[in-house]
């Protein structure tokens, strides 16, 4: 489960910041938080990983927004607000559960759209069109000009249903 969580963290950050390096850096940040089993400030994380505090904060705040790290807020003796970050098994479990829920919703809507209508596919560029779109284009792909072919959705629906059921077991 930890590997799946680390994969989610890495890919989410890499996608958001359009940088695989940031994704790998986020993975290191959460691995550190998980392995240390303690709450750490962003400054402490930056020092331990030898990276800038600004990068650390940016990554941690994005992960917090996604619910991929835990955060605690406390007031120091000099009345400053200090945030400490942590990753534990509960955070990992909840993050994976939330991702599974989102995936199930997307698969469910895809199954619904496939069962409600007929679809046509271009055999050359593999673009998919609804019946209305195919009629509007005269049965010809607007991208490459190839004749569109009707597609039976039964196999796709079966695959999606199996994927939905496997996610349901999580």
From Swiss-Prot:
GO biological process, one term: transcription initiation at RNA polymerase II promoter
Pfam families: TFIIE_alpha
SMART domains, A to Z: TFIIE
Domain of life the protein comes from: Archaea
Gene Ontology MF terms: DNA binding
InterPro entries from the UniProt entry: TF_E_archaea, TFIIE/TFIIEa_HTH, TFIIE_asu, TFIIEa/SarR/Rpc3_HTH_dom, WH-like_DNA-bd_sf, WH_DNA-bd_sf
PROSITE patterns, alphabetized: HTH_TFE_IIE (PS51344)
Domain called HTH TFE/IIEalpha-type: residue spans: 1-93
Record keywords, A-Z: DNA-binding, Transcription, Transcription regulation
Sequence similarity: Belongs to the TFE family.
Record text on subunit structure and interactions: Monomer. Interaction with RNA polymerase subunits RpoF and RpoE is necessary for Tfe stimulatory transcription activity. Able to interact with Tbp and RNA polymerase in the absence of DNA promoter. Interacts both with the preinitiation and elongation complexes.
Domain notes: The winged helix domain is involved in binding to DNA in the preinitiation complex.
HAMAP family the UniProt entry points to: TFE_arch (MF_01909)
Function: Transcription factor that plays a role in the activation of archaeal genes transcribed by RNA polymerase. Facilitates transcription initiation by enhancing TATA-box recognition by TATA-box-binding protein (Tbp), and transcription factor B (Tfb) and RNA polymerase recruitment. Not absolutely required for transcription in vitro, but particularly important in cases where Tbp or Tfb function is not optimal. It dynamically alters the nucleic acid-binding properties of RNA polymerases by stabilizing the initiation complex and destabilizing elongation complexes.
Protein name: Transcription factor E
Encoding gene per record: tfe
């Amino acid at each position: 489960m930890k590997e799946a969580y680390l994969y989610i963290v890495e890919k989410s950050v890499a996608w958001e910041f359009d940088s695989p390096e940031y994704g790998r850096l986020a993975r290191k940040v959460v691995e550190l938080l998980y392995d240390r089993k303690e709450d750490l400030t962003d400054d402490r994380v930056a020092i331990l990983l030898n990276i800038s505090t600004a990068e650390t904060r940016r990554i941690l705040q994005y992960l917090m927004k996604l619910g991929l790290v835990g955060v605690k807020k406390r007031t120091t003796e000099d009345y400053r607000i200090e945030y400490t970050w942590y990753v534990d098994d509960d955070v990992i479990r909840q993050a994976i559960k939330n991702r599974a829920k989102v995936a199930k919703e997307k698969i469910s809507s895809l199954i619904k759209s496939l069962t409600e209508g007929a679809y046509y596919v271009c055999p050359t560029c593999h673009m998919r069109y609804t019946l209305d779109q195919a009629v509007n284009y005269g049965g010809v792909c607007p991208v490459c000009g190839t004749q569109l072919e009707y597609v039976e959705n039964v196999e796709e629906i079966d695959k999606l249903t199996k994927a939905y059921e496997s996610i349901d077991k999580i």
